Amino acid sequence: MSSSATVVPLAYQGNTSASVADWLNKGDNAWQLVAATVVGLQSVPGLVVLYGGVVKKKWAVNSAFMALYAFAAVWICWVTWAYNMSFGEKLLPIWGKARPALDQGLLVGRAALPATVHYRADGSVETAAVEPLYPMATVVYFQCVFAAITLILVAGSLLGRMSFLAWMIFVPLWLTFSYTVGAFSLWGGGFLFHWGVIDYCGGYVIHVSAGIAGFTAAYWVGPRAQKDRERFPPNNILFTLTGAGLLWMGWAGFNGGGPYAANSVASMAVLNTNICTAMSLIVWTCLDVIFFKKPSVVGAVQGMITGLVCITPAAGVVQGWAALVMGVLAGSIPWYTMMILHKRSKILQRVDDTLGVFHTHGVAGLLGGLLTGLFAEPTLCNLFLPVADSRGAFYGGAGGAQFGKQIAGGLFVVAWNVAVTSLICLAINLLVPLRMPDDKLEVGDDAVHGEEAYALWGDGEMYDVTKHGSDAAVAPVVV
């Protein structure tokens, strides 16, 4: 009887396999894939559940769906053109060249951010281009979930009144003309990256952008129905807490994935993230008790978010004591702007920012960026940043200049998002109304989607033909 040799597919032939290149670090690749996945879980189901629970019952479906749609739409835009606009070859000081990230040759090859090579004044290379020890597909995945969560955060300012069709148009336009500019300028090798502005993992690129863009879009869309704006208690605080918990734990991937490697910077970033977040939550809760005599669960969630946001631009470049200080400030300054200043300011009152994204992300993100300019520790900076001898003002030397860079970087992100978001909203409004008609605002989910979050069919509820339309009456469902 003849025998034949067993052929093992290349992918399973150990380290000699074509699927395991010499440059591949399996540990780094595994960590980066896990980090990307938990960041994705922050959005789906994290923010989907949080948005669905924190709004009024009649807007639960619409709010959750705005988040889900944005997550899906960003994926397609990202791999088709937006990834390379953010991290590809340089086109302009603020933009990379638009091209697809779908080719096998690109995706299975070693990851590289070509525009990140940093030169000294004499033209010699100071820092080589970022080249993680895993495939480009991993970087595309990791950065996509960051882009997606940014759009979902913008949605938080617009819940309860923006036309869904307008939102469908807004997502790809804002990703293309706003997010990619911030990402390339600060991370992908643009002018702020090479100037030395520090944004460890998205305080400016993600949170300031989302807070300012959301606030600006909310101005152009207009307010919710008056009765929705006057009183809107969460329809399900436990859902809100579930989404918040996914956010907090998912931030380990958010900030832990920032160095593109499973290294000591990642460990420091994850620890600092939890220190700052816990302190911010406690401070916010204490302020609620002192001024309003009651500890608020929703307030605690807001304090948690401001802590997460504030530490993000600094997580891998500050010491633990600085994370504690940042937590105190993250729990108090955004609390003041949201709970006190907002009620006194006519400008802030005029704009209906549904979930207060301007405060929890815009203010907290800018605060974190500025504090990074104070507390960035030189040794940690040298482990991560392309510009040598970067340090916060607290450490003397060039630290004062660093603080100035942080101010300038924040102002650029604010100005760009105000201008571009306004232009996008004005352009969309030429095609479709930005705001739902009043009759849909009165009803909510049932009028917009023909669905409700808590339709108790088993209790004998009748199918409402005045809302859905029907050829014949529908009998009650018996469960």
From Swiss-Prot:
GO terms for cellular component: plasma membrane. The keyword Transport applies. It is a multi-pass membrane protein. Its main location: membrane. GO terms for biological process: ammonium transmembrane transport. GO terms for molecular function: ammonium channel activity. Gene3D superfamilies: Ammonium transporter AmtB like domains. Keywords: Ammonia transport, Membrane, Transmembrane, Transmembrane helix, Transport. The keyword Transport applies. It is found in: Membrane. The chain crosses the membrane at residues 34-54, 59-79, 139-159, 164-184, 202-222, 237-257, 272-292, 297-317, 321-341, 355-375, 407-427. Belongs to the ammonia transporter channel (TC 1.A.11.2) family. Involved in ammonium transport. This is Ammonium transporter 3 member 2. It comes from Oryza sativa subsp. japonica (Rice).
